[in-house]
């Protein structure tokens, strides 16, 4: 049963991040930035979330004195995962070096200023659509490809970038993993690979294949994720690369980007602002959701415990909900109402056409993972934490 996790954990560590580029000012040297940067780490609920994942019963020894490289380090999943590993280093002596890849130096400085002087964290400015040639890194033990265009507006405004990040970007990361003799490669895939429910199942298991109309703009994201999974299997067969595939469902949490245009993110932003929640459909969509802490725990479980070549759904039915009910929960929390609005053509072009996408998480639970935050608790924590940063 999912529940709202409680802990008395706090962290007093106050360090910071070295940059793989000469001449970049540390975040502590930038007036007005450090206060914003430190707010998240000063939040008790956020540090409880980090501690919950840090304390998972996982074979952490596989990461001890090793190195981990991940793309999308400043994204919702990536930034949370970076915090978990670096706190694990500090508290439990994991001594895992993290190489974080991301396009925005400024975003990384604002997000990871706490680790500015930590030799076990290196941020590398990088666009995954370009080959990653870094001979100075030596052997990299684990590689995670998390970078992706993950919200609807990007699907319609940058359809080329959406596809190339998921295919060319993935290939660049796979090549890097092969060249640097990585022990394991994890490709963060998506619930969207399942397409539309044919009406024959209640939950998607990992072998399910639903309908996707490939001759549409919106098909770029799910089809490129499908292609990415096949590309991983090709590298496993031809290059001998050990790969695993965590399939993320609709993830939310306090590390979400304010630019995110997914429905749940829009609802949460309205909740933070204390405004009415805007629903741009009848709200009949029935989806799986997952709080970011549980999603990252799932990614780490797949990375450290998953069987080579296998895909795993990161989902729990206690967080499955219809979109209209999700909107109502957030509105009720803030004493507001749900109002209906017709989306413009650009917005509508990026929306998923799937009306029912519930994932079966049994395969991942068999590895020992379980969800700790149900949808009500996760939403409450997200809004509370993000409000504290205002």
Protein language model regions, located:
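Glycine/proline-rich active-site loop of Rossmann-fold NAD(P)-dependent oxidoreductases
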Residues: 198, 226, 251-266, 275, ...
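Glycine-rich NAD(P)-binding loop of the Rossmann-fold in SDR/ketoreductase-type enzymes
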Residues: 161-169, 215, 219, 223-224
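Conserved Rossmann-fold NAD(P)-dependent oxidoreductase catalytic core, especially the SDR/UDP-sugar
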Residues: 172-220
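Conserved beta-loop-beta element that borders a ligand/cofactor-binding pocket
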Residues: 190, 229-254, 265
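NAD(P)H-binding glycine-rich loop region in Rossmannoid oxidoreductase-like domains
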Residues: 125-165
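Mid/C-terminal beta-alpha module of Rossmann-like enzyme folds, strongest
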Residues: 305-348
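N-terminal Rossmann/SDR dinucleotide-binding element
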Residues: 34-142
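Conserved C-terminal active-site "lid" loop/helix of NAD(P)H-dependent oxidoreductases
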Residues: 292, 324, 347-370
């Amino acid at each position: 049963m999912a529940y709202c996790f409680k802990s008395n954990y706090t962290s007093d560590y106050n360090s910071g991040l070295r940059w793989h580029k000469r001449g970049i000012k540390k975040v502590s040297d930038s007036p007005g930035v450090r206060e914003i940067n430190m707010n998240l780490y000063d939040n008790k609920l956020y540090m409880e979330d980090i501690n919950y994942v840090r304390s998972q019963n996982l074979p952490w020894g596989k990461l001890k004195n090793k190195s981990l490289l991940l793309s999308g380090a400043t994204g919702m999943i990536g930034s949370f995962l970076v915090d978990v590993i670096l706190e694990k280093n500090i508290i439990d002596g994991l001594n895992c070096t993290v190489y974080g890849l991301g396009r925005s130096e400024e975003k990384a400085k604002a997000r990871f200023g706490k680790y500015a002087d930590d030799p076990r964290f290196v941020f590398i400015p990088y666009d995954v659509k370009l080959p990653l040639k870094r001979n100075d890194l030596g052997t990299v033990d684990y590689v995670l490809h998390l970078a992706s265009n993950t919200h609807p507006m990007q699907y319609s405004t940058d359809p080329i970038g959406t596809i190339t990040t998921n295919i060319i970007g993935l290939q660049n990361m796979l090549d890097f993993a092969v060249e640097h003799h990585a022990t394991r490669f994890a490709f963060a895939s998506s619930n969207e690979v399942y397409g539309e429910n044919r009406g024959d199942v209640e939950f998607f298991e990992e072998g399910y294949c639903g309908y996707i109309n490939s001759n549409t703009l919106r098909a770029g994201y799910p089809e490129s994720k499908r292609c990415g999974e096949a590309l991983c299997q090709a590298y496993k067969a031809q290059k001998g690369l050990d790969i695993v595939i965590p399939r993320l469902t609709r993830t939310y949490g306090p590390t979400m980007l304010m630019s995110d245009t997914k429905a749940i993110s829009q609802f949460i932003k309205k909740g933070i602002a204390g405004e009415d929640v805007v629903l741009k459909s009848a709200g009949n969509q029935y989806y799986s959701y997952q709080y970011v802490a549980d999603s990252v725990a799932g990614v780490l479980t797949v990375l450290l415990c998953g069987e080579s070549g296998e895909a795993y759904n990161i989902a729990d039915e206690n967080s499955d909900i219809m979109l209209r009910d999700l909107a109502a929960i957030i509105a009720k929390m803030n004493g507001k109402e749900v109002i209906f609005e017709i989306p413009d053509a650009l917005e509508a072009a990026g929306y998923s056409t799937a009306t029912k996408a519930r994932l079966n998480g049994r395969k991942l639970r068999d590895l020992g993972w379980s969800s700790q935050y149900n949808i009500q608790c996760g939403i409450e924590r997200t809004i509370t934490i993000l409000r504290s940063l205002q």
